[in-house]
Regions:
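The feature captures the conserved acid-bearing segment of alpha/beta-hydrolase catalytic domains
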Residues: 166-244
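Gly/Ala-rich beta-loop-alpha elbow adjacent to hydrolase catalytic centers
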Residues: 142-146, 150
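Bacterial Sec-dependent signal peptides at the C-terminal "C-region" and cleavage site
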Residues: 13-26
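Residue in the alpha/beta-hydrolase core beta-strand immediately N-terminal to the catalytic nucleophile
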Residues: 139, 163-165
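Conserved alpha/beta-hydrolase "nucleophile elbow" surrounding the catalytic nucleophile
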Residues: 45-47, 138-143, 194
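Conserved hydrolase catalytic core segment
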Residues: 152-163
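Serine-hydrolase catalytic machinery in alpha/beta-hydrolase-like enzymes
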Residues: 24-135
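Bacterial N-terminal signal peptides that target proteins for export
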Residues: 1-9
Length: 247
């Protein structure tokens, strides 16, 4: 039996802590904003960022009431990056050492990060908690490392989803993911990536796009001139994508 969630109110936001369910995983926290839902947009931050930094994103999304926005917090705290000493992660990475080795953008398509399954399971538990994610249409998405977790949930679980949003993500465990693409046939997917991304390769995102389309998913592809970022053009395209869902 799950423990009751704890609820802390702060302005327009509510902070929930949920139990890890039968898998005995540590609890996630999530900032919840907007209306009571549905529909609900669940957006996972990237490596070294946090739910608090992503919560203002609601101001750029034109989704009418009673839409709800949920920003889960990565379980690993105090991740030190070049520009943030208080960030969080979905699993530990050593990007600094990788960059110093001069290897450029890593190809993770054949990798199976040891913390990916845990993070995905925690997100699945959150999606199953009706106090946080009400029954009804759910759009799951993420940026960078968060996009990998969102994709893992989409392609390795049976969680009901109305759409998937992949912002500057990449292919991970490609062979396994691809074997499940067909199970999400018809799913709308928003996929955005910078052509000059030096953190996660553009080529891997483009390959993911082609394979998703071949499997019958409805991909909205938004390549842009830029690096590991989310420019205004992507936000505009994402708003158009969400509007076309008619949720």
């Amino acid at each position: 039996m799950r423990r009751p969630c704890s609820l802390l109110l702060s302005g327009l936001f509510a902070l929930f802590a949920i139990a890890g369910g039968c898998q005995r995983l540590p609890p996630l926290t999530a900032i919840v904003a907007g209306g009571t839902g549905p529909p609900t947009l669940v957006l996972l931050h990237g490596y070294g960022s946090s739910a608090e930094r992503w919560a203002p994103f609601t101001q750029t999304i034109r989704w009418p009431a009673p839409a709800r926005f949920v920003f889960p917090q990565g379980p690993d705290a105090m991740v030190r990056t070049d520009d943030a000493a208080d960030g969080r992660a979905w699993w530990p990475l050593d990007l600094t050492s990788y960059r110093q080795a001069g290897k450029g953008a890593p190809d993770l398509s054949s990798a199976r990060p040891p913390g990916l399954k845990r993070a995905a399971s925690q997100v699945e538990n959150l999606l199953d908690d009706r106090r946080i994610v009400p029954r009804g249409p759910v759009v799951l998405g993420g940026y960078s490392q968060g996009a990998m977790v969102a994709s893992e949930v989409a392609f390795r679980s049976r969680v009901p989803l109305s759409a998937l949003v992949v912002l500057s993500g990449t292919l991970v465990d490609e062979q396994s993911w691809e074997s499940h693409f067909g199970e999400r046939r018809g799913l709308p997917v928003f996929l955005a990536h910078g052509r000059q991304d030096s953190t996660l390769p553009f080529e891997a995102a483009d390959r993911m796009r082609r394979k998703l389309e071949a499997a019958g998913l409805q991909v909205t592809w938004c390549p842009f001139d830029g690096g590991h970022d989310m420019p205004t053009a992507v936000v505009i395209a994402l708003n158009d994508f969400l509007a076309r869902l008619h949720l």
